[in-house]
């Protein structure tokens, strides 16, 4: 039975449409688009920042510095991917409780998620800083860029608590259907980051260390903004009294959602590190080409990723409300949306890939431009496979089957390891270009039957 306090806060939630959004009513496509658009704009902005950051590093410090930042990218994906995945998993029970209108349970989840996140962030930060040098050695980082890569990576690892904090609190805000505020915070963080890049790199001559410190400070700002917004406008999320106490059952549910999702990203990251290691062995030119192409690739593929993130919240809320037919309709609508976007990317990438790569390096670096453009075009052919992967994976996560989504990450890892061991030695750079497409297709082979099984399982439970 709901307390009087819950009833008041439920009324507050319904009246403050700017703060929360109920995705269990209305057109599924409209709800998904409404939720995904701020996410997409935010991530495009974030990726544009990374493009500008790479351009500043590549043009004002040099190709070697750009390669140093790129040599760290796969390691960052491994570590930060775990943090981001775990926080996304912690938001799933919050979304489900919100969809079921059980606000007390929701706040218990929030309190325990904060407690778990503080422990995980501390441990991950300590281990990352301790083994940073050794990890760079294991991935065959070229000697001429090793020092810069080490400095940059250490500065990124020092920012893990802030990265974890932003993903945790923004995930809880999004669990209530509000994706706009995290978007505004990303805008603020990105602008501050770019300004600090200019100050530290161009003004102070701090090199790649300046880029790392700029990221550290901007991430800290984004955490402060999230906490301020929750306290000011989303009191529904703030635990009170015994809701703050440790709850073994809720903690177990949070870990069952968060750890598999975190491991999924880390397992995928292992495959990316294997691919990065194989690419590093090809020399600084290929490392720089990989860095430039990945920056532009993420600018385009973040749309697929964020349609998926929208599906996790959408499925979580509708599962809580026991509306299975809306879940199926939403997945179909998301797939149609993904295919329309793929057509747009093909029209843009195929003719303009070379031009986009020249943003990063001087016109004299023709080989870097050519290789990076080849990477972009090959990956673009397989974007439908990536779009299907993100929609199905996040939908499965939102429905509470995070272990299955983790197994899809295992499939990606196996595929990338296979490419690294056999295709890259045989095809050199072309083999590197095939790493992502092969991984996406392998994951889809697993995810399609997995999603159909989850649908069948939940329908049986509802009978």
Label every model-predicted segment:
Residues 57-77, 143-148, 208-209, 250-257, ...:
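Interfacial/gating helices of multi-pass transporter permease domains
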Residues 78-81, 125, 193-197, 223-227, ...:
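Hydrophobic transmembrane alpha-helices of multi-pass small-molecule transporters
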Residues 66-126, 163-182, 289-353, 386-408:
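Small-residue-rich hydrophobic transmembrane alpha-helices
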Residues 34-53, 155, 166, 189, ...:
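Transmembrane helical elements of multi-pass membrane transporters/channels
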């Amino acid at each position: 039975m709901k307390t009087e306090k819950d009833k008041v806060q439920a009324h507050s939630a319904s009246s403050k449409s700017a703060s929360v959004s109920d995705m269990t009513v209305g057109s599924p496509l409209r709800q998904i688009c409404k939720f995904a658009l701020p996410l997409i704009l935010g991530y495009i902005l974030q990726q544009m920042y990374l493009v500008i950051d790479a351009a500043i590093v590549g043009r004002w410090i040099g190709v070697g510095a750009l390669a140093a930042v790129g040599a760290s990218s796969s390691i960052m994906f491994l570590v930060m991917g775990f943090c981001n995945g775990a926080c996304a998993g912690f938001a799933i029970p919050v979304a489900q409780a919100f969809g079921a209108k059980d606000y007390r349970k929701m706040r218990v989840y929030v309190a325990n998620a904060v407690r778990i996140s503080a422990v995980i962030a501390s441990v991950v930060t300590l281990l990352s800083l301790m083994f940073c040098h050794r990890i760079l050695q294991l991935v065959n980082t070229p000697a001429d860029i090793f020092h810069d890569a080490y400095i940059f990576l250490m500065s990124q690892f020092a920012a893990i608590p802030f990265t974890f904090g932003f993903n945790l609190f923004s995930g809880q805000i999004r669990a209530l259907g509000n994706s706009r505020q995290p978007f505004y915070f990303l805008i603020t963080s990105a602008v501050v980051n770019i300004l600090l890049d200019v100050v530290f790199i161009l003004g102070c001559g701090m090199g790649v260390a300046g880029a790392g410190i700029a990221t550290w400070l901007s991430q800290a700002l984004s955490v402060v903004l999230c906490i301020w917004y929750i306290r000011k406008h989303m009191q529904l999320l703030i635990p009170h009294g015994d809701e703050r106490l440790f709850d073994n059952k809720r903690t177990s549910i949070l870990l069952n959602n968060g750890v598999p999702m975190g491991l999924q990203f880390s397992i995928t990251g292992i495959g990316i590190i294997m691919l990065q290691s194989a690419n590093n062995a090809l020399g600084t030119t290929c490392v720089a080409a990989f860095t430039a192409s990945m920056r532009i690739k993420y600018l385009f593929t973040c749309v697929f990723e964020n349609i998926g993130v929208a599906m996790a919240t959408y499925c979580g809320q509708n599962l809580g409300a026991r509306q299975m037919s809306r879940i199926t309709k939403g997945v179909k609508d998301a797939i149609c949306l993904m295919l329309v976007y793929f057509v747009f990317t093909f029209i843009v990438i195929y003719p303009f890939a070379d031009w986009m790569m020249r943003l990063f390096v001087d016109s004299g670096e023709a080989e870097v431009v050519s290789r990076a453009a080849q990477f972009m075009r090959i990956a673009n052919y397989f974007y439908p496979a990536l779009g299907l992967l993100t929609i199905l994976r996040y939908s499965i996560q939102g429905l509470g089957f995070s272990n299955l989504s983790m197994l899809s990450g295992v499939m990606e890892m196996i595929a990338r390891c296979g490419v690294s061991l056999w295709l890259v030695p045989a095809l050199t750079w072309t083999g590197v270009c095939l790493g992502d497409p092969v991984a996406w297709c392998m994951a889809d082979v697993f995810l399609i039957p997995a999603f159909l099984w989850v649908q069948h399982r939940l329908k049986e439970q509802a009978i």
